[in-house]
Amino acid sequence: MTFTEQLAAAWQRNDSLLCVGLDPDPHKLPLSLTGAGGAIFSFCREIVDATADLVCAFKPQIAYFHSQRAEDQLEQLIHYIHDAHPGIPVILDAKRGDIGSTAEHYALEAFERYKADAVTVSPYMGFDSMQPYLAYPERGVIVLCRTSNPGGSDVQFLQVDGKPLYQLVAEAARERWNTTGQMGLVVGATFPNEIARVRQIVGDMPLLIPGIGAQGGDIEATVKAGRTADGTGMMINSSRAILYASREKDFAAAARNVALQTRETINRYRHG
């Protein structure tokens, strides 16, 4: 199955638009795992097992693994998700952006080394920097558009021909880049008006939406702005609020409770 097919199936099977971000901060791991060998993998595995029936995707953030020399644990984690919870797509949050020859190796890293189902990329260097990822027809390519951080406005709101740059990215994705139907866009929950504008531009293209939970994005406004006609179309990401719901031995159960509450809150507004 392609990434988009897996995602659509997960939306329906788990009745969920929730994506759980896997950002394992060694300073916030449960006390029972502190200092243990393979602690990052063990922590993420417990979170995955506790939430897999509640999500439409998992999103490991590559920097949290690389900074701890835990690339092997990231490989192990993605393999584990695919083996233990087949049908749940894994988005490698790498935000890569470089010239074509280097991008070829980043694509190899994401799709052949880590076996991710999708990867996040930056459009700043243009379409040729994204082509190596699109050469993998079964994988997803999720392009930064209107990010959730306040500083994103420094560039994304620059006016070009009377339009903010983020809108031009959305238009390019719809009109020129997404020829194989593999693309999605990143649009932050902290900017619901922009979510609605991007949805208007790109139709049913999937949106990865960070920024709820610890970043303060409003779930009701996010869902109403970004949902498609059938009440899907989004991967609404929450990381810290779920991962670090507890530092005690009940951390996985606590994470599940927060994930369940978040999914149910999202679902309250999907069709209303």
Curated annotation (Swiss-Prot):
Any Pfam family hit: OMPdecase
EC number of the protein: 4.1.1.23
Enzyme class: lyase
Pathway it works in: Pyrimidine metabolism; UMP biosynthesis via de novo pathway; UMP from orotate: step 2/2
GO biological process, one term: 'de novo' UMP biosynthetic process
Reaction(s) the record says it catalyses: orotidine 5'-phosphate + H(+) = UMP + CO2
GO molecular function, a single term: orotidine-5'-phosphate decarboxylase activity
Active-site residues annotated for this sequence: K95
Record keyword Lyase present: yes
Keywords: Decarboxylase, Lyase, Pyrimidine biosynthesis
Entry superkingdom: Bacteria
Protein family per UniProt: Belongs to the OMP decarboxylase family. Type 2 subfamily.
Protein name: Orotidine 5'-phosphate decarboxylase
Provenance organism: Cupriavidus taiwanensis (strain DSM 17343 / BCRC 17206 / CCUG 44338 / CIP 107171 / LMG 19424 / R1)
